[in-house]
Amino acid sequence: MKRIIRNLALVCAAVLALASCNQEKTRKALLPNITGTAGEVIVVIGQNDWEGAVGTVLRDSLSREFPQLPQREPMFNLVNVPQAAFTSMFQVHRNIIVVNISKDVTEPGVLYRNDVWAAPQTVIRVNAPDSETAVQLIKENCTIIIGMLEEAERARMIRNAKKYEERNIATAVNEMVGGSPHFPSGYKLKKRTDDFIWVSYDPEYVSQGILIYKYPVVEGEDMMSPESLLAANSKMLMENVPGMFENTYMIMSSYAQPTVKYMKYHGLQFAEIRGLWEVHNDYMGGPFVSHVFYSPDGQEVIVLQGFVYAPKYDKRQYLRQVESIVYSFEWAKNEKENEKD
């Protein structure tokens, strides 16, 4: 009898969980689309706190300089909205930080939620009993807050790329390296060899490029050391990315030393290179970002490099767009996995 009751309880719990899940899916499906421009964050906070220590730490954290751009640009553009003005017009914004400072707060902390008033939306709430606690919470959670906002923007761009994908390009890249990023509509295959592919999107006054290449692992050499990575990149650029005139080709700029970080994203371990590029014997240049990782069998090094040329415009958003393509890389599914799908 006890076993029957226990089984019935489990069934009821499962049914309730399924119903709750379905209700949440229905709720999200009915939400309006987000508003606001990419890289913009609404900060809901009182004017005094915005102009005081809390606003200062938010600006220092979120408006810090975006790394490795030719000119200064902030990580995010912050827009202050007082609590009284936070109406439905602002509630559908893509990125929202609500700073709730009240002596009634008994559990200080930072809460993260998605799709509260619109979709796909990120809402971050800082609850604190006073301004000093709010400042401390923001400092302690700064890296997570930035990561959440960056991932939200990246996920939106990847979702769009998958929805409007140039599948013929992915097929070519798959054949060369066994996987591919997702290229959104408008990108074209510009150059292809056995170990190098150049994909480009070239609207007026802007060029966004993705370079995909591979080279063999040399036994006994640390292929992922900064020195090895930068040397391989320089060689590839000189051999495969010519400029507009004779004896011109892409190089890494000496204006700023490239940075190398080792990261992991969705199970893929890679080295991230950020820096500036220029054209030898010419006056073109811009930012780039690369992800470098091993092939599944460990016999080859694979590189995905996104770069931007936009002399008339700010570069941050253009770079984030090509970076999202690089982040969207997935290994090709085998036949058995395709059958399951």
At which residue positions do the language-model features occur?
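A short acidic-to-branched-hydrophobic micro-motif
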Residues: I42-I45, E204-N233
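Bacterial N-terminal signal peptides that target proteins for export
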Residues: M1-A9
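Short Lys/Arg-enriched alpha/beta "domain-start" segment
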Residues: G36-P70
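Surface-exposed amphipathic alpha-helical segments
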Residues: V135-R159, Y187, Q299-D341
